Every structure is written in C-alpha cells, then in structure tokens.
Amino acid sequence: ELNSISNIKGLKKLKNLRFTFGSENSTSGRLMPEYFLNQAGVEIKHFKGKKAGFSGSHDATIALVNSGAFDAGALNKQVWENNLKNNPKRTSNLELFWITPEYVDYHWVAQGDLENRFGEGFTKELKSVILNLDIKQKSHKQILDMFNAKRFIKAESKQYKNIEEIGRKLNKIR
C-alpha cells in the first residue's frame, strides 16, 4: 500500500504502477519528484508500460488519479492542500502517500526599470512589503492565503543551485 510510505526508500512501491507527473517542465510536478524517485531507485522505465504520464497540470493529475487512469501521481503540495480545503470531493478517494523534502521553489521577480518608473527605492520598498506580510493581520492573511503560504522568505540565487543541478541530471536543462 502506498499510504504506508514513510521514507524515500518506500517509493520503490511505485514500480510497475501507472504513474503520472504534472507538466513536463514543472519543478514540483515533475523535476523534484523524478529526482527523488531516482534517488529511491525508481526510474520512468520502471513504471507500468515503461513510461510515465504527463497530465499537464497539478489539478489534472488529481483528476486522472481519481478517475483511475493512473495509480499515482506527483503534484504541488499547495494545490493538493487547496483541493482538500476547497474541493474535497476531488480528493475524497485519494491519499497523500509521500511529501518531498523542502526546497526553494517559487520566487518573485520585478522588472529592472521600476526605480525609473516609480522612483528611487521602490524595489526595496516592494521587497520589504512582501517579506513583512504578517499572517496575523487580516489583510495580509488574505494575500498569503492566495499563495497558501504563512510567509515569504528571502532567497538567493545560490539556493536554486540544487534545482539547476537536478535539471541538468535529468536533461531538462542543458
């Protein structure tokens, strides 16, 4: 049973099952799940039919596994939690069986000309506002809830290095 997977080695239970990733280029729907599967000794060739599916989106992964088209799939944790909360019928026949270790994922970017357009210090102020959102304040909580987040943290380019290395190992980045 998949619901008893307690560590990465347990992912071997996915061998010979019909498995789908989300989008082929998704960090949380393909890249990181495939990396951890590989770490457990599971490669795409080990799935039923010696291939994996690609649903195209996290919501589609839920729908395809729920319909029985696939036995299991990988998707973004926030999408899963959002469906549990807001659309429980979609997930009522499904079970979460494993969560990848944490990694830096989404990031915020701004156009380089914001200082010219909105004045000196604008980018610094924008960054400060985003990083100081406080879930205890109702208006801030509404914003954070849209991202299913408790807060945002400062990240640096070097924190994405492992994702880049994984992308190269899986031939998704050349």
Feature names for model-found ranges:
Residues 1-29, 34-42, 46:
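A conserved helix-loop-strand patch within extracytoplasmic ligand-binding domains
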Residues 18-27, 51-52, 66-70, 112-116, ...:
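Second-shell loop/turn segments in exported
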Residues 24-28, 59-60, 78-81, 102, ...:
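Solvent-exposed loop/turn segments at secondary-structure junctions
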Residues 38-39, 64-67, 71-92:
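A ligand-binding cleft/hinge motif common to bilobed small-molecule-binding domains
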Residues 44-63, 102-104:
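Short helix-initiation/N-cap motifs at beta->coil->alpha
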Residues 46, 88-130, 144-162, 166:
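Periplasmic-binding protein-like
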Residues 164-174:
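Tryptophan-rich aromatic "cage" segments
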